[in-house]
């Protein structure tokens, strides 16, 4: 009989194939778990509850980047009256020289506006402007005006700065070459009232007046009323050295161009500021179609397009007759010494109340 145990051989377990199978199964389970975790990040349900997969590369190809939604914003358009200076039909009062009396003058009537003279018709400055030139004259009340103005300008009433332009003897005499109006002999010109004037054709004159207007706007005035924007109209006018009129049809056209040029300089200096620009005209000039060849005024040719209003000193009984379709609805402002009840055009500047 053969030696050893019969019917048995050495035991080797289940063998290598079983171990390989288990390893593969374990790997598949791990991969499936990882795939499920990744898939969850790209799973979504629609409104009907159906499951969808959104693969990252497919999403980038199919869906363009959407800009963030802009919230609905209600745009409030500003009132044209506010942009133009808050009111159109003004009932204004011209305040006097003494700031201590201003509140009394304002409360004496139902005014929605007021005017303050910042540069008088003789050239005197009633406000201590930062703009300086040799020969300027500053009023003794200038500091009182500076102190009183902020309260008025911060109030609800419409504000007008009255600014005289070319009748300024002291500056004309001390700055004759750069600013003064000369006679034909080369000296300063004296008009019929023995007064001296600035020359509107000279750049320094334009710059000075434009700078004053800018300061008025920056103070907070709603409107700047220019007065004495004219050449002299009294005296020996043939003795004025107006400058060369070469290239112009006549002397009057040259003078009108200089006045219009000065107004343009002021207007351009005020660009970007919410302020109106207005002009005072004598009654005779306004009734003559806005033309004064001697003074260089041609209202509807170079001036009116730059103006918001025209102020005209006039008798109360003539007011309604002056109003036209072209100049009315607040564009024309009569300067009155009294306001009669019979006037239907309720727009005025009351002088010397």
Regions found by a protein language model. Give the residues of each.
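N-terminal, intrinsically disordered, polar/charged segments of Gram-positive cell-envelope systems
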Residues: 42-89
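N-terminal Lys/Arg-rich, disordered targeting/topogenic segments
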Residues: 1-18
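Catalytic domains of carbohydrate-active enzymes, especially glycoside hydrolases
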Residues: 99-125, 215-227, 302-311
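Aromatic-lined carbohydrate-recognition surfaces of secreted/lumenal glycan-active proteins
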Residues: 94, 160-167, 225-228, 252-296, ...
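Substrate-binding cleft of secreted/luminal carbohydrate-active enzymes
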Residues: 38-47, 299-353
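Glycine-rich, aromatic-flanked loop segments that form ligand/cofactor-binding clefts
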Residues: 113, 141-189
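Aromatic- and acidic-residue-enriched segments that line the glycan-binding/catalytic groove
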Residues: 128-136, 168-189, 232-246
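Active-site-adjacent "subsite" loops/lids of carbohydrate-active enzymes
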Residues: 83-94, 166-214
């Amino acid at each position: 009989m053969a030696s050893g145990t019969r019917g048995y051989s050495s035991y080797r377990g289940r063998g290598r194939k079983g171990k390989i199978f288990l390893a593969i199964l374990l790997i598949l389970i791990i991969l499936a778990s990882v795939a499920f975790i990744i898939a969850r990040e790209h799973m979504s349900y629609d409104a009907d509850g159906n499951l969808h997969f959104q693969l990252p590369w497919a999403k980038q190809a199919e869906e363009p980047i959407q800009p963030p939604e802009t919230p609905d914003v209600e745009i409030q358009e500003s009132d044209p009256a506010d942009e133009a200076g808050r009111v159109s039909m003004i009932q204004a009062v011209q305040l006097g020289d003494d700031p201590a009396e201003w509140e009394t003058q304002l409360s004496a009537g139902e005014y929605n506006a007021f005017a303050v003279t910042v540069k008088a018709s003789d050239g005197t400055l009633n406000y201590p402007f930062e703009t300086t030139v040799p020969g300027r004259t500053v009023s003794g009340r200038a500091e009182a005006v500076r102190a009183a103005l902020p309260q008025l300008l911060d109030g609800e009433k419409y504000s007008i700065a009255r600014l005289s332009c070319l009748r300024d003897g002291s500056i004309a005499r001390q700055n004759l070459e750069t600013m003064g109006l000369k006679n034909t002999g080369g000296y300063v010109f004296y008009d019929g009232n023995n007064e001296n004037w600035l020359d509107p054709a000279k750049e320094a004159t334009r710059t000075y007046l434009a700078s004053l207007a800018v300061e008025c706007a920056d103070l907070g005035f709603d409107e700047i009323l220019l007065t004495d924007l004219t050449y002299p109209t009294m005296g020996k006018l043939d003795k004025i050295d107006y400058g060369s009129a070469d290239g112009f049809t006549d002397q009057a056209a040259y003078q009108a161009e200089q006045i219009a040029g000065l107004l343009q300089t002021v207007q351009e200096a005020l660009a970007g500021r919410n302020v109106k620009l207005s002009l005072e005209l004598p009654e005779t000039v306004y009734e003559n179609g806005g033309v004064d060849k001697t003074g260089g005024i041609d209202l509807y040719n170079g001036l009116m397009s730059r103006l918001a209003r025209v102020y005209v000193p006039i008798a109360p009984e003539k007011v309604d007759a002056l109003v036209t379709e072209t100049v009315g609805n607040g564009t024309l402002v009569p300067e009155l010494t009294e306001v009669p009840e019979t006037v239907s055009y309720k727009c005025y500047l009351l002088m010397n109340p």
